[in-house]
Amino acid sequence: NVSDGVTTVYLCGDSTVTDQSAEIPYLPGACYASWGQALPAFLDGRIAVENQAHCGLTTETFRQEGHMDIVKHFLRPGDFCLIQFGHNDQKLPHLLADREYPVNLRRYIEEVRNLGGIPVLVTSPGRNIWKEDGTYHELLAEHVQAVKDVAVSTNTPVIDLHEFSVRFYEKTGMERSCGYFHPGDYTHTNEYGACLFASCIAAGLGRIFPEVFHVTAGPSDFTPPENLWDLLDSQNNRAGGTEQKEQFDAMEKSTAALLKALEEADQASAEE
């Protein structure tokens, strides 16, 4: 239960948003962490964060597994609902940016508003993947644009985490940017990356809703050491499992597997 006078922010999303599990011994660079779990550090005590995001989910499976039902059950008028999907949707033909993906986003927005809540769309953070010529490899452009189009058509606020992340990678460079990700992973952040992205989300909320969100400084001087991956052993942190959501998360550790999955989804969609 949330006390009266406290606004709740509900988070709907995938592994880049979810509360990741802690590891012992704790090392900020070696553990998985997502911006959703770091967000409270940037907001004052009048805001509660309820993270319903889970690994491997899409705009479809988030609903199918009952997570949206939980949000709708507890959401009160004036509460906020941040919605970020895309990494896993783009691996399925029927959830591509010109198919059911925007339809699902609109449905979430409508449901939140019908309950008196305030929906906010968030574009997915970019992957730290680069082309052989040294330029950034943009893989989410279509889904990011779909989010922006839905935001315009439904008059919904949007926080462009994708733009923030890609600009950061290009400014910082691939090697240095790796320090913000779990070792061997180019999609899932560690504590450094979680705090970096949470700062963007908090700043966006403060800019759009200054009367509600008062952004704090968050962790100070929280940056990874150089060559972090060289300092850590990533071999014991490989994903496994056979469920779709586990397979999707495992793909993010292999650039080749990821690119193949995205290509197959595009081909399957074109053949339908």
Q: Where does each model-flagged region fall?
A:
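Structural motif
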Residues: T58-G66
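Gly/Ser/Thr-rich helix-start
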Residues: D14, H54-L57, H87, A194
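Serine-esterase "nucleophile elbow" of acetyl-processing enzymes
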Residues: N1-A53, D69-P77, A250, A268-E272
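Alpha-helical cap/lid subdomain in secreted, periplasmic
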Residues: G66-A217, A261-A270
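Acidic, Ser/Thr-rich low-complexity intrinsically disordered segments
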Residues: W229-E272
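C-terminal/domain-terminus segments
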Residues: I208-N236
